[in-house]
Amino acid sequence: MVTNAGTPGISDPGFTLVRRAISAQIDVTMIPGPTAFVMALVLSGLPVHSFTFRGFPPRKSVGRCKFMALDKASPHTLIFYESPYRLEGFLQDALQTFGDREAAIANDLTKMFESVQRGKLSALLAAVTQSKPRGEYIIVIAGIGKGEKEEGEDTNS
């Protein structure tokens, strides 16, 4: 399997091909290549020692919020992929789910118009609403910090 868009098997159908090959007892190997989420993680300025890659979230808000809620209390830096058509909705749902955490949006990494925006989710959402998103996006969101708690969490336990 050869790809022109990063490491095969990361958020693409390559995963299915690899699993089927393994099930059929076919030897599988790979030559490591670039993976956009690793580059976005490093460039985000957020902690890199422990992270969770979540890939593409569900397309609709209700499913996306449930998907994000699974990691609401996670201390790990969270990484998502998103399309330009759903970026604004994603950021609205992320702000609602995670609160106004530090985050970064990476776009068109390794290309001529590569960009990384950093700031609170609210500021990133405001910036996205002022421009027309293009290309694929990687969103990196800080995990829950020390002293933070989930809404309704009992701090006396």
What are these regions (language model features)?
Residues 76-157:
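A contiguous loop/helix-start segment that scaffolds small-molecule binding in enzyme catalytic cores
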Residues 7-10, 59-60, 113:
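Short, small-residue-enriched loops and turns at beta-alpha junctions
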Residues 4, 33, 56, 108, ...:
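Cofactor-binding loop segments of dinucleotide-utilizing enzymes, especially the Rossmann-like FAD-
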Residues 13-18, 68, 118-123:
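Charged helix-capping and loop-helix junction motifs
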Residues 16-74:
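Class I SAM-dependent methyltransferase SAM-binding "motif I" and its flanking Rossmann-like core
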Residues 1-6, 10, 78-82:
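Acidic beta-strand-to-loop metal/phosphate-binding motif
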Residues 8, 35-38, 111-112:
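Short gly/pro/ser/thr-enriched loop/turn and capping motifs at secondary-structure boundaries
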